[in-house]
A protein has these predicted regions:
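Positively charged n-region of N-terminal signal peptides that target proteins for export
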Residues: 1-6
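Bacterial N-terminal signal peptides
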Residues: 7-17
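Scaffold/interface architecture of coatomer-like assemblies
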Residues: 20-328
Length: 328
């Protein structure tokens, strides 16, 4: 009966995922509100978690903004765990599952977690719940092969998070970073270039799907933490051609841009043994973030970049968050 329950759970999870993932509804958020997840450290890099609303000053394009909502670092998160189950990860799946399960143990009791696997498909294995045992069971069921549908998975995660209303939001994505569709598009660009120009021919922002997920992350104030597997590291390729190096390098730069634009951090996994430690670092970082919202004094939706700066006046503390957004 135990195995029957497991297989029934797997069937229901994947069946519902195929239905949900097939939807292409736009994310609807009150885009006039800017949400920032903010980490604060001292000069030695130690997290500061005892600040309140009056400790912060927010500037947009140099103009001070009025904080409309503030949540302390103890407020719960809604987190999507994205697990790369493409063919390139097959040889170390046990490491992935063990490390991901330990990440759950490091979260706060009220944090809600959803688990999503991606490869050629994107499957919701378990929806948001504070029941970490359910999430752990879902991680064990993760399996797949084939291509890497990374950007579709991130977009799907953002769509799920849009239903989490006013909760603090984050995505933790374990991947080599090489999205198959974007790589194929990059290859087409490079096909007309001589090898001497390939290293500088690609731009991270050249992918439409990539740019859309950045915009949607902006709208919700979602912080994204990529955990980059060594199989996607261009420096680890064995005697790569200029084309191969350019493709992998652009994929890794996109992961870095995702982290930078959303206020997260890119954690490169150099050895598989480090995976659990880096998951723990991400969990610890989530527990130190404040969430701040403001209604911009510039109410134009002109698509222009707005630079955001966060200060903790009268101190030498350092605040980290996303550096801005496009006003759409």
């Amino acid at each position: 009966m135990h195995y029957l329950r497991i297989y029934f759970f797997l069937f229901i999870s994947i069946a519902s995922a195929l239905t949900i993932a097939g939807q292409d509804d736009p994310i609807k958020i009150d885009s006039s509100i800017v949400r920032l997840n903010v980490g604060v450290v001292d000069q030695r890099g130690r997290p500061i978690t005892s600040l309140d609303r009056t400790s912060f000053a927010i500037y947009e394009d140099g103009i001070k903004q009025e904080i409309s909502r503030f949540e302390a670092s103890t407020a719960p998160f809604s987190v999507v765990m994205l697990l790369d189950m493409s063919g390139s990860t097959k040889s170390f799946r046990p490491n992935i599952k063990l490390s991901a399960a330990r990440f759950l143990d490091a979260l706060a009791p009220d944090d809600r977690v959803a688990v999503v696997e991606f490869y050629s498909k994107v499957n919701l294995l378990s929806d948001f719940s504070a029941d970490k045992r359910l999430a752990a069971q879902s991680i064990e069921l993760a399996n797949g092969q084939g291509e890497t549908n990374l950007y579709k998975a991130l977009q799907f995660a953002l769509e799920r998070l849009s239903n989490e209303r006013t909760r603090r939001k984050a995505i933790v994505v374990l991947t080599d970073g090489v999205d198959t569709n974007a790589r194929n598009d990059d290859r087409k660009i490079l096909s007309s270039k001589p090898e001497s120009e390939m290293a500088t021919a690609l731009k991270a922002e050249s992918s439409g799907a990539f740019n859309k997920l950045l915009r949607d992350a902006d709208l919700q104030g979602v912080t994204i933490y990529p955990l980059a597997l060594p199989t996607g590291d261009p420096k680890r390729l064995a005697d790569p051609t200029p084309l191969q190096f350019a493709l992998y390098d652009n994929s890794r730069r996109r992961l870095q841009l995702i982290a930078d634009r959303t206020g997260g951090r890119l954690n490169a996994i150099n050895r598989l043994e480090e995976m659990g430690k880096l998951y723990a670092i991400v969990a610890a970082d989530l527990r130190t973030l404040y969430t701040i919202e403001y209604d911009p004094s510039n109410d134009k939706h002109d698509g222009q970049w707005r630079t955001v700066k966060i200060e903790v006046p009268g101190t030498e503390l350092i605040a980290r968050s996303r550096q801005g957004y496009f006003a759409r």
